[in-house]
Regions:
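Short beta-strand elements of ligand-binding domains
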Residues: 12-16, 31, 179-180
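Leloir-type glycosyltransferase catalytic cores
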Residues: 194-201
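A donor-sugar binding/catalytic signature common to diverse glycosyltransferases
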Residues: 146-187
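Short, charged/polar "capping" segments at the starts of alpha-helices
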Residues: 21-22, 37, 85-86, 119-125, ...
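Catalytic donor nucleotide-activated moiety binding site of glycosyltransferases and closely related
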Residues: 108-143
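A nucleotide-sugar donor-handling region in carbohydrate enzymes
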Residues: 22-89
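Conserved catalytic-core segment of nucleotide-activated headgroup transferases in glycan assembly
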Residues: 73, 82-114
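Glycosyltransferases and closely related glycan-assembly transferases
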Residues: 1-13
Length: 201
């Protein structure tokens, strides 16, 4: 509305898919997997986020008093939360945790589990119960712990429900693995995103 009134005095940039006619904006900056097409569309490879490499480096030592002080290298699991597409049922969490535990045991890695704002409290407690005292589960949302876990990790695993957290993990340049959950309905948009990252290696 303001754009229509002020005409050229307002330069209008929208971040992500506006879900309305693209011609209402001077520019739209949106992830490539949103499949927006137009002369005023600027596409990004991943989801747009605010993390910087400096932030990650500056917080590297934050978790050193939390994690187990041994020779094992660290794998970090970043957990999202339930969405319209993915369910965080005990069955789905058990499948992820069991697959991950086998890898940890085989390669003798230490796991650090980081929850997000969307992670159900029962999923956090289940992770603590499942992995026990030999690994580290951060029990509450803690941005510094998140940044530190990204910095310390040899490998990063992110649940499939969050394009943003996958994009943030990619900032580290480290190997990223996706913890898959069977979708409740067609998740082709998320699949496009993951396929794009796979092609980028």
């Amino acid at each position: 509305h303001l754009k229509n009134i002020a005409k050229k005095r307002v330069f209008n940039i929208h971040i992500q898919d506006p879900k309305v006619d693209l011609n209402h904006f001077d520019f739209i900056v949106a992830p490539e997997h949103d499949s927006l097409i137009g002369q005023n569309v600027i596409s990004t490879k991943g989801a747009i986020h605010y993390l910087t490499e400096n932030e990650i480096i500056e917080n590297k030592d934050y978790l050193k008093s939390f994690i187990k002080n041994d020779e094992r290298k660290i794998w970090t699991l970043i957990m999202g939360g339930p969405t319209r597409y993915y369910d965080y049922s005990t069955k789905n969490m058990k499948h992820i945790f069991t697959s991950l535990y086998k890898l940890l045991k085989k390669h003798d890695f230490q796991l650090v589990v980081i929850p997000s704002m969307r992670t159900p409290i029962n999923s956090i407690h289940y992770a603590k119960e499942f992995f026990g005292d030999n690994h580290t589960v951060i029990m509450k949302v803690d941005k510094k712990a998140y940044l530190s876990a990204l910095a310390l990790a040899e490998n990063i695993i992110v649940t499939c429900d969050s394009s943003s957290m996958i994009s943030e993990a990619a900032l580290t340049g480290k190997p990223i693995y996706i913890a898959g959950i069977l979708p409740k309905k067609n998740d082709k948009r998320f699949q496009r995103f993951r396929n794009l990252f796979r092609e980028l290696n």
